[in-house]
Amino acid sequence: MVEAKNIIVVIPVYNCHRYLSDAVTSVLNQPCKGIQIILVDDGSIDGSSELCDTLSAQHETISVIHQKNSGVSAARNAGIEYALSLCQGQEEASYLAFLDADDAWTSNFFDASVLDAMMQGYDLIGFLSCGCNISMTKRNEPTLLQEGIYTGGSSSIWIHASQPFCAMLYSCKLLSTYHLRFQTDLHYTEDKLFSMSALYLAHRILLQNKLMYLYRQNAASAMHTRCHGIPYFAPIIHGYLMVDKNMAPFQNSQREELVAGRQLACIYVMDMADEHFSHFGTLKAFNRFMQENVDSEELSALLNGEDSRIPANAAYQQLQQHPVAYVMKAYLKGVLLAFPRLCVKISLVKTLRDARRFPIAMNESTMEE
C-alpha cells in the first residue's frame, strides 16, 4: 500500500532564499501529509543554506544535504541517491518527484486519486504544468495531454515534448533498476535527456490532465533564453546524440532502437544556426563548428539524410547550397528582432506582455484559481 512516506520530493537549492519557503510550503500543505522532502543545498551563499537547516529543524519530514557548488544535475543526483536509501526495500511502492526551489505545486494536488494511481504500479505518472508570473498571482493555460496508459519505448519518447520533466512521478524501482541519473556535464536540457531516458525505459506510463506544477517564467527574459549561439547549443546537440547511444544496450523486442535523440540533434543544429546568424554570427564560425565538433561526421551524415529513418534536413541543405543567401536572410531577421528585444526591457511593455501571457488569476495563498 502506498503511504505518504513513500512519496519523496527532491528540491535542489542554489541561492534561492526568496522563493524556497514557498516551494517547501506547497508540498507541506498537500492533503497527503508526511511527504518526504530532500533539500540539496548546492553551495548557496545567499542564506538559502541556513534556511534549509531551519526548515529541517521545524519539520521532521525534511532532510538536508549540503554540498559544494556542483550544478543542478549533481544536486538532483545526490537527492536521488539519498531518496533511494530512504525507500530501500520498498522501491516498487515509492515514487520520486522533482521540484525546483523557485517553483511550486498546486494545492490539493496530492489527493486520493493520485495515491490510487500510484498503487497501480506505473513506472511513470505524468501530470500538467503551467507557467506563472514572478509573483505567482497569474498563470497561463496548460497544454493538455493525451490522457491514457502508455507502454514505454521509442514510440513514447515524444511525450516529453509536451510533458515537463518536473510534472512527473518517477518510480524508485525504475530509477534504481536502470541507474537513471542526470548528466552532470550538461548545463541545459539535462532534464529533457533524463525524461527521455525514463520514457524509453519505462514499462507502463500513465498521463492525467491534473494540474501539478507551477513554474515561474520571467517574460522579460523569455526572448533571450536561447540567445547563446554555438556555446549554448553545442552541448545540447551532443547530449541528444548521446542519449540514443546510452539507451542502445536496453534495446529489445519490446523496445525499438531509439532515434529520437538524433532527430532532435538535427533540429537543434538548425536552431543553433538561426540563433547564431540572427545575432550576426559569421558563416566561418558556424562552419568551424560543423567541421571540428566531436560529432561533426555523424551530424553531417544525419543532416544529409544518410540515415533512412531521418529525412534530410531541407534547411541545412539550403544553407550548404546557398550559404550567402541563407545568412543574409538570417541577418535581416536579426535586424527585425532587435527592436522587440529592446522594447521588452521597458517596464510598461513587460506589464502588458505579462497580462497577455498569464491571463488566469490565481489565489496566491492556495496556488489555485
Language-model segments: residues:
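Short beta-strand/loop segment that forms part of the nucleotide-sugar
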Residues: 34-43, 63-68, 101
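Donor-binding/catalytic cores of nucleotide-activated saccharide
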Residues: 101-208, 213-231, 267
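Glycine-rich, basic loop-to-helix element that forms the pyrophosphate-binding segment
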Residues: 67-89
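Short aromatic/hydrophobic "clamp" motif used to bind/position activated sugar donors
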Residues: 96
